[in-house]
């Protein structure tokens, strides 16, 4: 299948690549089906893209590229919803807010996207802790 995206051209994908979000994601609750593909010529960023809306793609990054000790505790209800039997089946991604000023690019570490890569279901959750910021700077200033 092909997805003609507004910003990334034509992306080829298969039905098995589609990840289902029962509640959508905050701000886009009506969108339930997404795919993930790498940003061209970049090993760090990926695109989390709706297959239902050609101009709805979000840049995402693994939190472990930013915070080596990033840790979340899923509640039992969340584990059940995601059908997670094993934490190795969980893919954790965080949304990136781009800016033309590289120092103002931020990552939302407070609301990770959790995906069961085996079952292809996902949910964006909110961590009830001040440990992580909604607007964590992608690039820390050197001391």
Swiss-Prot record:
InterPro entries membership: Flagellar_assembly_factor_FliW (IPR003775), Flagellar_assmbl_FliW_dom_sf (IPR024046)
Cellular compartments annotated: Cytoplasm
Listed Gene3D superfamilies: BH3618-like
Subunit-structure text: Interacts with translational regulator CsrA and flagellin(s).
One GO BP: bacterial-type flagellum assembly
Keywords: Bacterial flagellum biogenesis, Chaperone, Cytoplasm, Translation regulation
Annotated SUPFAM superfamilies: BH3618-like (SSF141457)
Protein name: Flagellar assembly factor FliW
One Pfam family cited in the UniProt record for this chain: FliW
Originating species: Clostridium botulinum (strain Okra / Type B1)
Summary of the function given for this chain in its UniProt record: Acts as an anti-CsrA protein, binds CsrA and prevents it from repressing translation of its target genes, one of which is flagellin. Binds to flagellin and participates in the assembly of the flagellum.
Family matches, as HAMAP family: FliW (MF_01185)
GO cellular component labels: cytoplasm
Similarity-based family: Belongs to the FliW family.
């Amino acid at each position: 299948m092909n997805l003609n995206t507004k910003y990334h051209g034509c992306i080829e994908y298969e039905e098995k690549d589609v990840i289902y979000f029962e509640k959508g994601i905050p701000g886009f609750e009506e969108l339930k089906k997404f795919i993930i593909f790498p940003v061209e010529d970049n090993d760090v960023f990926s695109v989390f893209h709706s297959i239902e809306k050609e101009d709805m793609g979000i840049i995402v990054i693994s939190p472990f590229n930013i915070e080596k000790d990033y840790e979340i505790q899923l509640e039992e209800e969340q584990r059940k919803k995601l059908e997670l039997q094993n934490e190795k089946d969980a893919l954790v991604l965080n949304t990136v807010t781009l800016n033309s000023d590289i120092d103002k690019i931020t990552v939302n570490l407070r609301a990770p996207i959790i995906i069961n890569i085996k079952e292809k279901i996902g949910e964006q959750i909110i961590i009830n802790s001040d440990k992580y910021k909604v607007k964590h700077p992608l690039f820390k200033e050197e001391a």
